[in-house]
Structures are given as structure tokens and as C-alpha cells.
Amino acid sequence: MAAAAAAALESWQAAAPRKRRSAARRPRRREAAPRGREAAPRGREAAPRGPEAEFESDSGVVLRRIWEAEKDLFISDFWSSALETINRCLTKHLEQLKAPVGTLSDIFGNLHLDSLPEESDVATDSIPREILVTGTCHLKCVCYGIGNFATCIVARNQLTFLLLLLEKCQIPRSHCWVYDPLFSQLEIEVLNTLGVTVLSENEEGKRSIRGEPTIFYMLHCGTALYNNLLWSNWSVDALSKMVIIGNSFKGLEERLLARILQKNYPYIAKILKGLEELEFPQTSQYMDIFNDTSVHWFPVQKLEQLSIDIWEFREEPDYQDCEDLEIIRNKREDPSATD
């Protein structure tokens, strides 16, 4: 994985701006083959620099920008403040899971510096990282709706936050599943190079954790995505093993009429009394990137205090009468989709 990233960055360096050739000037009959590729046989012209070669340089540019954004985020006041917010939540969450090796509060109090793991070598130079040791409690991560990070600085910063979070929690990148229906082929290849697992199907947020403690990272996603996620894990056992970093549920309650929330997003409406929420800090540098973002977790004590009737209702959401859905449906499952 590190070799692939290094190769991509070599391409980026090789693609430094050059003087444009006059349109009236005829191109050379043969060009040198790109590194790692055979030259065209004699008597046949080599193909001009095509999309694949351009992609190689473009992926290097994206990787370099991610690396630069990561360095800026890592030294920012926002990162340290947001990390403290996540710390407070995960401390309680992992204590609830009865992690065998100490508590997360002890772990945060004994941070140590280490070098980046090999899979995150996105550039030749590196900066020290604080690594968390979470004992035998192995977390997984799912990321929905990160956006077009190759072209959007907001999405790129949200991705770099995810990468730092994975590193901090010692979640292997291969144990982080990522999906956005708007990903370009370039972005999918970059994510593969970074080592995360790109999902091939639009789950619409309907992913069961299957008993595995999981952090869901889904910033600025459509409300239906959160509602679907809750439906897919609608039990005390499953919800108590989940952490959701995403749109503030309190904010949703304040913005939406109660009848709209209960009708269109019933699982969000029913879980409001069964969760705890900590808001992300707000700084001017990252105001537009992490606004309206909170960390949510589900204490067992609160979940068990909810009415039994709440757990018996498990009808799958369909949103047929919901306006302004704000998510892209899976066409194979969407009854309104046409061939």
C-alpha cells in the first residue's frame, strides 16, 4: 500500500506544470513510455498521453492535498478539542462494553508517540502521532457520505479527520468501510491506495453491526440515513455497541416539527431519550466543515428505560410520502425508480 502511494506521489511530482506546446507544432511521432510501462513496438506509434496517465498524476495530487490537510488539522486547536470530545464519549462507551484492559480514560492519560503505520505512508516525510491502545476491544468504523474529496475542500478535511481518528483509535484502515454514491473512479482509487475498504453497493445506511462495536462517521448526511441505521440496529444490545459521529440529533429535534419527525423518521424520534450527545467544538478555521456535528452514544441504562412498545415496532422505513429526502436511494430497492 505504501509503495502504491509512493508511486502515485512520484507521478504527481513528475506532473509539475510545464510550458504548453504551440498548437501549430506537430507532436513527436513517438514519446517515451511512462515509468513501469513498455514502449510501443517498432513501426507503431505509441498512444498519446491518455486518461490512465493523467489519472496517475491526478491521484498523486489528491494524495498530496490529503496529506497537507492532515498536517494542518493535526496541529490545529480544533483537532485537540474535538479529540477531547470524542474521548469523553468513548470513555463511557468502552467502559459500558467492559473493555478488559483498563478504561479508555486511563489510556488517554498515558498517550505515547509513535510513527505512522506503514499503511498510512501517504508521503515520504512523516509527523509523529499519538496512538491509542484500546486493549482487546477492537472497534470497526463505517463512513457514509464523505463527499467528493478530490475537488471539495470540506469533504477533504472531513476525510483527513477520519484518517486521524482511525489512527488514534487504532482501527486498521481495512476495518473502515466507506461509501458515497457520488464517488468518482479517481476517488475510489485514492481510497483504495489509502487502505480503507470501499463499499460497492449503496446500503442506504441499513447496515447491521452484527454485535461488533462500531463507530459510524457520517457528517452532514441526510436524516433518512441516520433513521435507516437505527432501524437496522433496533435493539438495546446493538445500539449500546454503536457510536455515531454526525448531525446533531438535538438539532434535528429543534429544526423539525414533532409530527414530521415522528412520521418520517420514527426511529430518530424514539431514540432521543435513549442517547447522550456531545457537540463538536466550533472554531473559525473549521466552522463550515464540522458545524452541527455531535458524538452520540447509547447508554444501556437509558435504553432499558424506554417503553417496551418502542422496541416492538420494527417496520422498515420507506419514505414514500417524505419530501426532501436528502439521500440517494438504491435503485434496485427504490419502488419509485424506473428502469
Swiss-Prot record:
Basic and acidic residues: bias regions: 30-47
Reply yes or no: does the keyword Methyltransferase apply: no
GO biological process, alphabetically ordered: heme biosynthetic process; regulation of circadian rhythm; regulation of heme biosynthetic process; rhythmic process
Stretches for region Disordered = 1-54
Q: What spans are recorded as compositionally biased (Low complexity)?
A: 1-16
Biased region (Basic residues) positions are 17-29
Q: Which GO terms describe its cellular component?
A: cytoplasm; nucleus
Positions of sequence repeats: 30-36, 37-43, 44-50
Q: Which parts form a coiled-coil structure per UniProt?
A: none
Q: Where is this region: 3 X 7 AA tandem repeats of R-E-A-A-P-R-G?
A: 30-50
What InterPro entries is this protein classified in? SRR1-like (IPR012942), SRR1L (IPR040044)
- Highest taxon above the source species: Eukaryota
Record Pfam families: SRR1
Tell me where in or outside the cell this protein is found.
Cytoplasm
The question of whether Cytoplasm is a record keyword is answered with yes
**Keywords, comma-separated and alphabetical:** Biological rhythms, Cytoplasm, Heme biosynthesis, Repeat
Q: What is its main location?
A: cytoplasm
* Expression triggers: Up-regulated by hemin and 5-aminolevulinic acid.
Family from the record: Belongs to the SRR1 family.
- Function description: Plays a role in the regulation of heme biosynthesis and in the regulation of the expression of core clock genes.
Q: What is this protein called?
A: SRR1-like protein
Q: In which organism is this protein found?
A: Homo sapiens (Human)
